[in-house]
């Protein structure tokens, strides 16, 4: 007896065909579909229970559970602020020069000051305080405005040439000797050669000799007769090979031609009713930290 032939339902195709190869319209597995539906349900439920939809101008929907990571962070900040309240009050009440003699304050300022520095100062002065072009190193003892802790504190608090703070350190910008027609291009070239010479770099002897006289007449009033700089003017030492903007011919020429005048922001200034950028304790902590890095005077 012959067996009854079995018929197997063929899977339909999508109708797409490439070089004789057809795309089957195979149904997705049930487990996959149910998992997909479950994720949709979970997503809707999560968006209802937790903050999710930014339909308000300043915040998202709060969610039925009222969870807020921002509120959690604020609680943690408040908790640690309360823990540090006593030592911060002590720091504010202690004379700046006496901080280094107090082990508790030394420990606190090294940690808190480092945190402040990494948050607010490292963008310009570098993560290790080694400086960047246009932003001085805080490690080498080559200070434009002085490295005593009181000076560091004042400069952090009120900034340098900050137009917003009336108590900022106002020192004159370096003149633009070419733009302001103070020197001719040939004279600038001679001064550049002189600066190269006194900083220990190869220089044209003839031009350097002529540049020495021009320097004495136009530059010594800020940089000093010996070119070692004057803290009162914020003018750098030109003999030690430490350069804020660069000591090559092109950079020196540009500096003399167009001048320089860096700005450091005031970290205590605030608009009326606004909160200062840094608190008094934070300013003291970071000033003490910077002073302890090795370059403090």
From Swiss-Prot:
<feature type="domain" description="Cytochrome c 1">
    <location>
        <begin position="108"/>
        <end position="199"/>
    </location>
</feature>
<comment type="pathway">
    <text>Energy metabolism; oxidative phosphorylation.</text>
</comment>
<feature type="binding site" description="covalent">
    <location>
        <position position="121"/>
    </location>
    <ligand>
        <name>heme c 1</name>
    </ligand>
</feature>
<feature type="binding site" description="covalent">
    <location>
        <position position="219"/>
    </location>
    <ligand>
        <name>heme c 2</name>
    </ligand>
</feature>
<keyword id="KW-1133">Transmembrane helix</keyword>
<dbReference type="Pfam" id="PF13442">
    <property type="entry name" value="Cytochrome_CBB3"/>
</dbReference>
<dbReference type="GO" id="GO:1902600">
    <property type="term" value="P:proton transmembrane transport"/>
</dbReference>
<dbReference type="GO" id="GO:0020037">
    <property type="term" value="F:heme binding"/>
</dbReference>
<feature type="topological domain" description="Cytoplasmic">
    <location>
        <begin position="1"/>
        <end position="35"/>
    </location>
</feature>
<dbReference type="InterPro" id="IPR004678">
    <property type="entry name" value="Cyt_c_oxidase_cbb3_su3"/>
</dbReference>
<dbReference type="GO" id="GO:0006119">
    <property type="term" value="P:oxidative phosphorylation"/>
</dbReference>
<comment type="subunit">
    <text>Component of the cbb3-type cytochrome c oxidase at least composed of CcoN, CcoO, CcoQ and CcoP. Interacts with CcoQ.</text>
</comment>
<keyword id="KW-0406">Ion transport</keyword>
<keyword id="KW-0679">Respiratory chain</keyword>
<keyword id="KW-0479">Metal-binding</keyword>
<feature type="binding site" description="axial binding residue">
    <location>
        <position position="174"/>
    </location>
    <ligand>
        <name>heme c 2</name>
    </ligand>
</feature>
<dbReference type="GO" id="GO:0046872">
    <property type="term" value="F:metal ion binding"/>
</dbReference>
<keyword id="KW-1003">Cell membrane</keyword>
<feature type="topological domain" description="Periplasmic">
    <location>
        <begin position="57"/>
        <end position="297"/>
    </location>
</feature>
<feature type="transmembrane region" description="Helical">
    <location>
        <begin position="36"/>
        <end position="56"/>
    </location>
</feature>
<keyword id="KW-0472">Membrane</keyword>
<keyword id="KW-0349">Heme</keyword>
<feature type="binding site" description="axial binding residue">
    <location>
        <position position="223"/>
    </location>
    <ligand>
        <name>heme c 2</name>
    </ligand>
</feature>
<keyword id="KW-0249">Electron transport</keyword>
<keyword id="KW-0408">Iron</keyword>
<dbReference type="InterPro" id="IPR050597">
    <property type="entry name" value="Cytochrome_c_Oxidase_Subunit"/>
</dbReference>
<keyword id="KW-0812">Transmembrane</keyword>
<dbReference type="InterPro" id="IPR038414">
    <property type="entry name" value="CcoP_N_sf"/>
</dbReference>
<feature type="binding site" description="covalent">
    <location>
        <position position="124"/>
    </location>
    <ligand>
        <name>heme c 1</name>
    </ligand>
</feature>
<feature type="domain" description="Cytochrome c 2">
    <location>
        <begin position="206"/>
        <end position="294"/>
    </location>
</feature>
<comment type="function">
    <text>C-type cytochrome. Part of the cbb3-type cytochrome c oxidase complex. CcoP subunit is required for transferring electrons from donor cytochrome c via its heme groups to CcoO subunit. From there, electrons are shuttled to the catalytic binuclear center of CcoN subunit where oxygen reduction takes place. The complex also functions as a proton pump.</text>
</comment>
<dbReference type="InterPro" id="IPR009056">
    <property type="entry name" value="Cyt_c-like_dom"/>
</dbReference>
<comment type="similarity">
    <text>Belongs to the CcoP / FixP family.</text>
</comment>
<feature type="binding site" description="axial binding residue">
    <location>
        <position position="264"/>
    </location>
    <ligand>
        <name>heme c 1</name>
    </ligand>
</feature>
<keyword id="KW-0677">Repeat</keyword>
<dbReference type="InterPro" id="IPR032858">
    <property type="entry name" value="CcoP_N"/>
</dbReference>
<keyword id="KW-0813">Transport</keyword>
<dbReference type="GO" id="GO:0009055">
    <property type="term" value="F:electron transfer activity"/>
</dbReference>
<dbReference type="InterPro" id="IPR036909">
    <property type="entry name" value="Cyt_c-like_dom_sf"/>
</dbReference>
<dbReference type="GO" id="GO:0016491">
    <property type="term" value="F:oxidoreductase activity"/>
</dbReference>
<dbReference type="GO" id="GO:0005886">
    <property type="term" value="C:plasma membrane"/>
</dbReference>
<keyword id="KW-0375">Hydrogen ion transport</keyword>
């Amino acid at each position: 007896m012959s067996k009854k032939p079995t018929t197997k339902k063929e899977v339909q195709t999508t109708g797409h065909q490439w070089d004789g190869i057809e795309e089957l319209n195979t149904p997705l597995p049930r487990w996959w579909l149910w998992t997909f539906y479950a994720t949709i349900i979970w997503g809707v439920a999560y968006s209802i229970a937790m903050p999710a939809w930014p339909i308000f101008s300043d915040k998202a929907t709060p969610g039925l559970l009222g969870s807020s990571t921002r509120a959690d962070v604020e609680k943690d900040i408040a908790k640690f602020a309360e823990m540090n309240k006593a030592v911060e009050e002590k720091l504010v009440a202690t004379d700046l020069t006496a901080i280094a003699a107090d082990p508790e304050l030394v420990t606190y300022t090294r940690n808190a000051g480092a945190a402040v520095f990494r948050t607010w100062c490292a963008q310009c002065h570098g993560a290790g305080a080694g400086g960047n072009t246009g932003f001085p190193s805080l490690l080498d003892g080559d200070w434009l405005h002085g490295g005593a802790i009181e000076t560091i504190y004042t400069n952090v608090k009120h900034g340098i040439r900050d137009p917003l703070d009336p108590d900022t350190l106002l020192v004159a910008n370096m003149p633009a000797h070419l733009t302001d027609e103070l020197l001719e291009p040939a004279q600038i070239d001679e001064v550049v050669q002189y600066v190269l010479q006194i900083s220990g770099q190869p220089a044209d002897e003839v031009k350097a000799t002529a540049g020495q006289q021009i320097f004495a007449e136009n530059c010594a009033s800020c940089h000093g007769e010996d070119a070692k700089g004057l803290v009162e003017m914020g003018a750098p030492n030109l003999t030690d090979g430490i350069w804020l903007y660069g000591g090559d011919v092109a950079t020196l020429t540009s500096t003399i031609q167009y001048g320089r005048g860096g700005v450091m922001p005031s970290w205590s200034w605030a608009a009326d009713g606004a909160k200062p950028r840094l608190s008094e304790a934070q300013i003291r902590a970071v000033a003490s930290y910077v002073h302890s890095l090795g370059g403090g005077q």
